[in-house]
Design a protein with these regions (language model features):
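Long, contiguous interaction/recruitment modules in multidomain scaffold/adaptor proteins
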Residues: 1-43
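Terminal, low-structured helical/coil segments at or just beyond the last alpha-helical repeat
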Residues: 126-159
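Residue-level recognition of tetratricopeptide repeat
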Residues: 71, 105, 139-141
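Alpha-helical segment of the N-proximal tetratricopeptide repeat
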Residues: 36-69, 73
């Protein structure tokens, strides 16, 4: 099943493979990380899992191998890893490119809002919070709750 069908890479998948390799979920083994070895969607999800595991540089290296790096999801993940490396303004640039492609992508708006909080721009973060509420149809969605937490806790992320 592909991540677009709701599966995400797990921490177990990350520890299975050494640096420079990527987990092939379908065939259950590690492959040398190179362009085209897996569909872009799978590579992007693996990159995001690397970033969530604090392996930001590896995440960016994986995203560099995408055949089409200019999807909303790939740009969001690049923004996330870049921001986590301390390059907040550069990360914001990737988030804004992602939003140009898909203005209704709630997760990128959450991460953009978190970046604004880090810069002290709470007003801009609250604008993203309002957009997320409209996208989700309520305030009862993970992206809204996570950004609301970051705003009220000076940029701290929920665990």
């Amino acid at each position: 099943m592909s991540p677009s069908a709701g599966q995400r890479q797990t921490q177990e998948d990350l520890t299975t493979c050494r640096r420079g390799q990527i987990w092939d979920r379908r065939h259950k083994h590690c492959l040398k990380r190179k362009s085209g070895v897996l569909p872009d969607a799978d590579m992007a999800e693996y990159a995001y899992a690397l970033a969530k595991a604090d392996r930001y540089a590896e995440a960016l290296e994986t995203l560099d191998l995408l055949q089409n790096p200019n999807t909303a999801r790939a740009l969001n993940y690049r923004g996330y890893a870049t921001r986590k490396l301390g390059r907040t303004q550069e990360g914001i640039g990737f988030y804004l490119k992602s939003i140009e492609i898909d203005p209704n992508y709630a997760q990128v708006r959450e991460y953009l809002g978190e970046a604004y909080v880090l810069q002290g721009n709470v007003g801009a973060a609250k604008e993203q919070l309002n957009r997320i509420a409209k996208i989700c149809g309520s305030t009862d969605c993970e992206e809204y709750e996570d950004l609301e937490f970051a705003i009220s806790h000076n940029g701290e992320e929920k665990s």
